[in-house]
Regions:
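Outer-membrane beta-barrel channel domains
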Residues: 1, 6-129, 181, 185-189, ...
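Low-complexity, polar/charged sequence tracts that form flexible coils or short amphipathic helices
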Residues: 61, 147-150, 158-160, 172-176, ...
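Conserved catalytic-core segments centered on acid/base and nucleophilic motifs
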Residues: 101-106, 157, 167-169
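A short, charged
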Residues: 105-108, 141-145
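Transmembrane beta-strand segments of Gram-negative outer membrane beta-barrel proteins
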Residues: 125-144, 165-167
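Flexible, membrane-facing loop/turn or short amphipathic-helix motifs
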Residues: 143-147, 205-208
Length: 219
């Protein structure tokens, strides 16, 4: 292990990874940057398989001890029994394909209730209640011709909300540069899924002139 190799420390209580050394910043909000320093970030590999990726949360009401069957594109993807009253299913396995989920509640007397839950995804979407973050304090690790040691910080946050929405944001900062990004993503069902974000950046050049700009990204 050399001085600059990445040294990961797994923090299972936080489901996060602390990295010291050479690594890369996450690419979900800003472009990924090579760095030499310290980063604390959520680690999806510490989650159960049923909690990885995006899947909608299913809400329903059972009148009795009932069997709940969930299908997508004609295939059964989950089946379980629930007690009488309101229920929530938030641990569906993520699927690669889009397509509304068909929910069937079969009561103990044989009566059946059916309804659909929209499902479509873009990479930024998170499950309801999922909070994903990263914080970096480091030096930019460029190519061998780089002469100046450019120190920077970055922080990002992605939060899964009810009804298929996700909000996210982040900031980057260095001596003569600031950037702020804010965005949202949504599972729109038959209309598909979309994410849109706006980044505002400001920089100061060597002659002390200030420049700023905006960029918008749609996915």
């Amino acid at each position: 292990l050399s001085l600059h190799d990445a040294l990961p420390i797994y923090l299972r209580a936080l489901k996060s990874e602390l990295t010291a050394g050479d690594s890369y910043t996450p690419s979900a909000i800003f472009d990924s940057l090579p760095f030499r320093g310290i980063q604390l970030a959520s680690d999806d590999n510490m989650l159960p398989d049923s909690m990885k990726g995006f899947a909608p949360t299913i809400h329903g009401i059972a009148k009795s001890n009932a069997q709940v069957t969930i299908r997508q594109n004609g295939y059964t993807i989950d089946q379980r029994y629930v007690s009488p009253g309101a229920f929530t299913i938030d641990d569906l396995y993520s699927t690669a394909s889009s397509g509304d989920l068909s929910v069937e509640i079969k009561e103990s007397d044989g009566s059946i209730t059916r309804y659909s839950v929209p499902y479509s995804a873009v990479p930024i979407l998170q499950r309801e209640g999922r909070l994903k973050y990263a914080a970096t304090a480091a030096s930019y690790r460029g190519d061998s011709s780089q002469k100046e040691d450019v120190k920077f910080g970055q922080a990002t946050l992605i939060w899964g909300l009810p009804h298929g929405f996700t909000v996210y944001g982040g900031t980057q900062f260095a001596d003569h540069y600031r950037a702020l990004a804010l965005g949202t993503g949504a599972n729109l069902g038959d209309w598909g899924a979309i994410s849109v974000d706006l980044t505002q950046a400001r920089s100061t050049l060597a002659d002390d002139s200030e420049h700023q700009g905006q960029s918008t990204r749609f996915l």
